[in-house]
Amino acid sequence: MNLEVEIAGIKLKNPVIAASGTFGFGREYSKLIDISEFGAICTKGITLKKRIGNPQPRLCEVYAGIINSVGLENPGVEAFINDELPFLKSFDTKIIANINGFSKEEFVELTKILTSLVDMIEVNLSCPNVKEGGMVFGKDPKKVYEITKSVKDVASCPIIVKLTPNVTDITQLAVAAENAGADAISLINTVSAMAIDIETRKPLIKMVTGGLSGPAIKPIAVRMVYECFKKVRIPIIGMGGIMNYKDAIEFFIAGATAIQIGTVNFINPKAVCEIKEGIEAYLERKGFKSIKELVGSINI
């Protein structure tokens, strides 16, 4: 069975991508699985300079999910190129660099630095954990257009724009990204959330609020992928609470060309293998010859 998919001319051997964040730069997981099993690996968020992230506690478990407010902890782009990228390139998989800027100029500079070194760049306009920048950019279609166009003007590799779900109409963001030249969009990022310790009456996250991921957000994500599929022609990478192959299949039917898995990696490092096997068995059982035949095939 052929599980190959194509995004902006880049062929992935299968549609399962490691989502930015929970997979880090793959080192920890490489001790548990062959990370070449992924069609692509999306790095944790990269900034121009090193960031120590938000104060602890910055992660808590809730019903059917996790709230995090890590705050883009990362070594900075120079250290990523020198220390992490050679390791990632030693595996048989595509590399997607997730970039985060606090101004249009920073997004452009990161793109210039990385565009010839990776297979694709994912522009994170939707991180809900950092007060200065990301959320403002991600919620405003005009800013989404402006930054996407600025990044595309200096990019030699395909550009994926990652969208926030914390808006009234995510399709406006999707259309803005497409009109600005985005090669693909990815959605959804985490949903703004909060949890409280009733004994101390204090938030469980030091920064008070964070981003909810995991099974709790899957129905929201599927709905938003479906809505965007009806509005744009560029590929959609779907994510949000995918725990097994059945979840992945829902995203394909709703309109996703590929999927990203994040929170499940914490629980089951071998999820990528199980999801791939499940997808293949489903396609065979239903008589599909490829993933492409399944994409957007919902019966209304």
From Swiss-Prot:
GO terms for cellular component: cytoplasm. The active site is at 127 (nucleophile). This is Dihydroorotate dehydrogenase B (NAD(+)), catalytic subunit. NCBIfam families: PRK07259.1 (NF005574), pyrD_sub1_fam (TIGR01037). The keyword DNA-binding does not apply. InterPro entries: Aldolase_TIM (IPR013785), DHO_dehydrogenase (IPR050074), DHOD_1B (IPR033888), Dihydroorotate_DH_1 (IPR024920), Dihydroorotate_DH_1_2 (IPR012135), Dihydroorotate_DH_cat (IPR005720), Dihydroorotate_DH_CS (IPR001295), Dihydroorotate_DH_I (IPR049622). The keyword Transcription regulation does not apply. The lineage of its organism: Bacteria, Bacillati, Bacillota, Bacillota incertae sedis, Caldicellulosiruptorales. Its EC number is 1.3.1.14.
